[in-house]
Amino acid sequence: MTRILIIEDEISFSEALSFLLEKEGFETEVAETGKAGIASFNKSTFDLVLLDLMIPEISGIDVCRTIRTSSQVPIIMLTAKDSEVDKVVGLELGADDYVTKPYSARELVARIKAVLRRGTPEDSSTSES
């Protein structure tokens, strides 16, 4: 099952997002701060990270930077920050997509599936020889 880490400090939002994604067949884990998100990422394996930019303790930008030092797991920034500068910075730091709130649930699920499809075959396969 595809595992998604949601790093989002608004509990009602993260609960609704988890419900939506679990209904679509994904397994989710939620972290409410940047620090907790990095800790969760380091202790478990995830196929994708949904990352809010405005989170406590460590900013979403710094979380993205930290994850990128050790992993190429897909990151989708999911945030209310919708300026062109924010989008460009997020993508240049290594985000694979950038979705602004409010968003369409159908569009978000489609973007998640598209990013996961783009993963390289050697990244998603395990050697069973």
Question: Which ranges hold each PLM region?
Answer:
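N-terminal/domain-start alpha-helical segments
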Residues: M1-D123
